[in-house]
């Protein structure tokens, strides 16, 4: 099957599932009573438009010319690997992609780096990631749903190393590996943000075999309630950094949290400017606190 047709099929599947979850959440009343505000929908629209029409094309163009300049001899030379090793390559792609993403995600949530230059980079990631955690109104009733998957402020996707890893795979000619790997991760990420509760039901199942099996699976894969706790306004916001492979949260970051209850409150507290303007919330970036980072003496 041609890579283009495979990509089209996964695009339709992803958009279809995305739309299904949004409609499902609406029918279940997940957007009522302050759970989702007008500003949340506005932010979703801005994020979607910016990602699709500005940032993603810019990433593809910039990464392609970077690779072509630095590694001109590698362009398209490894596509034949897919004929013999497609499944192992997809597994390797997902594991590497998840590790790169989890590393930066962990860095964005960590305490301020002691090295002042690392602190500047970290401040960028913290600011770029903040929008993904600011939802709902000031009443604390806001909840996340499938639409939150794509809520990211400018610069976050462009500066993620796993996105550059993906375009590098494309440059090498590993189209099918990239299509399958990114599609599987996207579908799983949408499912993790959606208001699904099956994982909590299985964790509380009366059968020990079912509950313990689900508990074990939560150490391998990320399920909705694990990611919902990452979006909570609690200490769990600094837990569960992965989108797909929970093994890294468990064995590498030591930040795995498994709960049978939903978070009490979602989202980070917002400043008055963030509460007032969706454009400020999307575009504002405190690049550098010069005094605290030690570049200048007061």
Task: State what each model feature region is.
Residues 22-44:
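Membrane-interface helix-loop junction between the first two transmembrane segments
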Residues 173, 177, 259-298:
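A membrane-cytosol interface segment of integral membrane proteins
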Residues 49-90:
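Long, highly hydrophobic alpha-helical transmembrane signal-anchor segments
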Residues 83-268:
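Membrane-embedded catalytic scaffold of the fatty acid hydroxylase/desaturase
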Residues 9-14, 40, 44, 82-90, ...:
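Residue-level signature of transmembrane alpha-helical entry/exit and packing/kink sites
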Residues 1-18:
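Hydrophobic transmembrane alpha-helical segments in integral membrane proteins
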Residues 46-60, 146-159:
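Select subsegments of transmembrane alpha-helices in polytopic membrane proteins
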Residues 20-24, 54, 58, 62-70, ...:
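Alpha-helical membrane-inserting segments
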